[in-house]
From Swiss-Prot:
This is Small ribosomal subunit protein uS8. One of the primary rRNA binding proteins, it binds directly to 16S rRNA central domain where it helps coordinate assembly of the platform of the 30S subunit. Part of the 30S ribosomal subunit. Contacts proteins S5 and S12. GO terms for cellular component: ribonucleoprotein complex; ribosome. It comes from the Bacteria. Keywords: Ribonucleoprotein, Ribosomal protein, RNA-binding, rRNA-binding. GO terms for biological process: translation. GO terms for molecular function: rRNA binding; structural constituent of ribosome. Belongs to the universal ribosomal protein uS8 family. It holds the Pfam family Ribosomal_S8.
Length: 130
């Protein structure tokens, strides 16, 4: 059976891994998933990530905890295959009053809502992270 929404699957694996206090979670890899993991690492939400394997590459995400609690409190998919959500640069949302980030897919690649606002770019809102 093919996967309908691989990004939702990735976010769910991270959420479930943190709920079960796992050190790391593995999932099938893709360029978009690696870009999301790189953004989460740059923003400090995960410790690290690595792509393993040649024929069927797997993405391993090392989860981050602070005082035995997950760093990521909320991980919510916004734009999905059945309902795409696009926002102009002036309409980009602020997650939790600026404490969280919205991951935005722009013409210049994936970036946080702050970086997209600074670059003057709008795009597809992939997910909210807080």
């Amino acid at each position: 059976m093919s996967m309908q929404d691989p990004i939702s699957d990735m976010l769910t694996r991270v959420r479930n891994g943190q709920a079960a206090n796992k050190v790391a979670v593995k999932m099938p890899s893709s360029k978009l998933k690696v870009a999301i993991a790189a953004l989460l690492k740059a923003e400090g939400y995960i410790v690290d990530f690595a792509v393993e394997g040649e024929a069927k590459p797997e993405l391993e995400v090392t989860l981050k905890y602070f005082q035995a609690k997950p760093v990521i409190e909320q991980l919510k998919r916004v734009s999905r295959p059945g309902l795409r959500v696009y926002k102009k640069k002036d309409e980009l949302p602020s997650v939790m009053g600026g404490l969280g980030i919205a991951i935005v897919s722009t013409s210049k690649g994936l970036m946080s809502d702050r970086a997209a606002r600074k670059a003057g770019l709008g795009g597809e809102i992939i997910c909210y992270v807080a």
